[in-house]
Amino acid sequence: MWIRDARPDEADALTALVLRSKAHWGYDAAFLATCRDELTISPEELTARRIVVAEDDTAVLGVTSLEGRPPDGVLGLLFVEPSAIGGGIGRTLYAHVLDTARELGFKRLTIDSDPHAEPFYRALGARPAPAGEGPLPRLEVTLTPRADWAQAWTGGRRAVHLGNVAEFQGQFGEVTQEARRAAGHYASLAAFASPHPAALVLPRPVPGEWTALVARQLGWGQVEVYEELTGPDVLTRPALVRHLRGLGLPFVPWGHTDASGELSGRGLPPGALRYESKRASHTLFRRLAPDHPGIAVPEQWTPATRREAARLIAARARSGTATVVKSEHGAGGSGTRVLKRRARARSLPRGPLLLEEYVAGDGTPSDPTYDGLVDGDGQVHDVGVAAMDVADTAYQGATVGPGAVPEELAAHALRFGRAVGRELAATGYRGWYDVDFVTGPGGRLAPTEINLRLTGPSAAFMAKLRLDETRGGDHLVRSLDRVPLGARLPETELIAFLRELTERCAGIDAVLIPSIPTAGYEPDPYVGVLVAARTAGRLDAAEALVRAASTDLAGLFG
């Protein structure tokens, strides 16, 4: 489905659609006759009323209008073909109106709602307006300004997303076949590389109905999907390159590579990715820490050999202290282990090896993370602080939104994360980054690594911004990147399961957004999702529902 401007030659057909939609709610012919003049669309007014339609390959499915001049406007029409009601068309059109209104500088919209439509608008954040004349419920929508970071990220526009996870990782060492396969699944998160994609370029096929399901939840318009393509693959297809560049939209890669720089025309200078190294980032942390009383940097050692590392680990184990063993590069906890006893040298990873003081997270949350970005001019923008879910050393997901991280802890992370961003900007880095922490004794934050790319928490921040803008309120969003399934599900059954889950979550006033839909038929099947709600209780209930339903598949298909 896509949205376009209405054409003069379809004014009569759109009027007929509006009247059919109105009649759907049980109004008789006599009543509709009294409404006809008000609901008639004339060819001459299409532009002035900013009338647009939603259509698929076969028919126009809905129509809406944004009327008036900034700062105060009116949502004049929003009608959906009766056979398409309940399919997310109205929500997508409503989101389009809000997007357009923000772009044009509107601050408020009023809606004279049909009584039957009032619950729809109320669920999307509209509230009763001050009493006014007229027989219809009058609602009002306050359009909050777009977040500073979102404006800096894509100029507030849609974007072309490149899921180049394995390519990015391959810049720092060999990517095994197993890791490449996992990265292919994880690359689905590139759908959330900005709040509203126009096109996705992904390294593996995704279920055909997945993007439509996500679009329905987030009010996206039509999204072009190009599968089984890496950045270098795209560059070998001149027609595709011309098309993507011809969209005139920002390119957003998962991480910067030579290929993504060539596609976007915005490459990075040599050395701009240096702080992706855990050794280099630790050096930076120690340099910055004296100006940040809330930060305590763990000790780090760089043994020359695995044998030397084993001796140091054993000595620390004898004194009752654990040691973190890190590879210099690695994502999501890969290449990182916590050892509480001695280890044989041959069991340790090859290559550059780092040993680090183990900090047992004893705060709430135990693993916060700061997300920010450096814009094209080198200015740093805070995105926020998330509470990560980390099992042992493996990243599982993150929660963003009100109350996810206590204010004092968040303030320390924001200040330090901002300082890191300024150092990144000085190296020539431009783009998204995060700083991961462990909450140590006394609530002091121990920084552990920098990621110079998009991350799991970034997907939660993008979804939160989109939900807040299109549904109102201040959402909590939780990313669950690996929810085990009780049975392997082929694509058709997986989409049916996810569709049912979205409806069940809606029934408890929560939102479910499938984020990783490609691993349902793996030997150890799983799915990734984002869940959202306006309260912590509903968010927890939604997660519990998703996990229980996923486990229960064993009884249905096992």
Language-model-detected regions and their locations in the chain:
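Conserved acetyl-CoA-binding loop-helix of GNAT-fold acetyltransferases
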Residues: 86-99
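A long amphipathic alpha-helix within ATP-dependent nucleotide-binding catalytic cores
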Residues: 395-442, 486-507
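Conserved GNAT acetyl-CoA-binding A-motif
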Residues: 101-114
